[in-house]
Design a protein with these regions (language model features):
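Nucleotide-activated chemistry modules centered on ATP-dependent adenylation/adenylyltransferase
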Residues: 1-221
Length: 221
């Protein structure tokens, strides 16, 4: 057994810091390891705190369902840390694309289709997206739980200067009004058409005319 039951896990939490270089885990608590030794170290740390037991019902390749109980303390710590670092350094669209490709890649590996053009294409995507995934993530482990308590990267897209909603050189309050009107344009057009066809309540207001010039709602400030 790699993992203790939570009732036998320590009564005090432990913080572990995992370092990544271009998406690859390279260190634990500041000490560099090769891949095998790094996993073994995280298995020991995570297993000690009851982390990483996965109990699930899954679909086999042949179609039958089976129940599996897996121990992966080191893998669970890596997944939590790596996902958090990606959230810090990758933009929203890239993260969304990764969420689409990740399960496809997992299915490919599970089904033994490693030597395929599909896998090579996915690898090209991974290589590009992971190039900036460099930094450290701090995890607090306690009786089976894994909580992210810190993350740091020189490639972070988060910057306090740009999230204060105050005036700065990147973001101006006045920019928001035009963006909101443009972003909501499809919904406004649909509402106008529904009113014209009698498919939506008019709230006691007359239905707008069909031309853009006569529709204040369609005019972009």
């Amino acid at each position: 057994m790699l993992t203790r039951t939570v009732t036998k896990a320590p009564d005090l939490p432990e913080t572990v810091v995992i370092g990544f270089d271009a998406g690859t885990p390279v260190s634990v608590n500041g000490e560099r390891f090769g891949g095998v030794d790094l996993i073994a170290t995280l298995n020991e740390i995570g297993g000690r705190h009851g982390c990483g037991v996965v109990d699930l019902v899954e679909d086999r390749l042949v179609g039958m369902k089976s129940r599996g109980v897996y121990e992966t303390p080191g893998g669970s710590l890596l997944y939590a840390a790596h996902s958090e670092l990606e959230q810090l350094v990758l933009d929203r669209r890239t993260l969304a694309a990764k969420d689409l490709i990740a399960p496809r890649y997992a299915d490919l590996v599970y089904e033994g289709r490693w030597w395929t053009t599909e896998r090579e294409a996915y690898d090209a995507f991974v290589n590009v997206t992971q190039d900036r995934v460099t930094g450290t993530v701090s995890l607090r482990l306690y009786k089976g739980s894994i909580a992210v308590v810190g993350r740091e990267s020189s490639n972070a897209l988060y910057d306090e200067r740009f999230v204060t909603f105050g005036e700065d050189d990147v973001y101006e309050q006045s920019d928001a009004a035009g963006f909101i009107r443009l972003f909501a344009l499809p919904a406004r057009v649909r509402a106008i058409k529904d009113q014209e066809l009698g498919l939506a309540p008019t709230l006691d207001a007359p239905a707008p005319e069909a031309t853009t010039a006569e529709h204040p709602a369609l005019q972009i400030a």
